[in-house]
Amino acid sequence: MRCPTCKYNGTRVVDSRPADDGNSIRRRRECEKCGFRFTTFEKVEESPLIVVKKDGAREEFAREKVRRGLIRACEKRPVSAEQIEEIVNEVERELRNIGDSEIASDLIGEKVMNKLASLDEVAYVRFASVYRQFKDISVFVEELKDLMEKNKDR
């Protein structure tokens, strides 16, 4: 690996340990020429997930889009950035575990809604109203009734 300071091509690994819950390896390296120490991360390159949209268009899965939707739904709610990030991680992990390279956008939305329903009901309703594109108040009220019915069962 090339030294970021002197650009010499010879470095040695000083320390190596798992990082990111075992999903990557953190390595401390030292340049053999100038002695500069730096950190690198080694991670498995995963094949891209392709999202098949409702109109049939295909695009690469973007964690940032899921995160933005969650942030918007959770505005002014007692939901932390860590909780939002955990939902993004869980959704991506579940999608990858399916084993298909193409995933329907509906499945992503449903997974996010299921996670939000157990975390914060107001955020769930906000997300559902955008995701399901409620056309009028009656559809919105039906969704609220369903949510209240589910809560009675708990």
Swiss-Prot record:
Superkingdom per UniProt: Bacteria
MF terms in GO: ATP binding; DNA binding; zinc ion binding
Disulfide linkage: none
Organism of this sequence: Listeria innocua serovar 6a (strain ATCC BAA-680 / CLIP 11262)
Cited Pfam families: ATP-cone (PF03477), Zn_ribbon_NrdR (PF22811)
Family per record: Belongs to the NrdR family.
Protein name (Swiss-Prot/TrEMBL): Transcriptional repressor NrdR
Protein role: Negatively regulates transcription of bacterial ribonucleotide reductase nrd genes and operons by binding to NrdR-boxes.
Textual note on the cofactor: Binds 1 zinc ion.
Cofactor: Zn(2+)
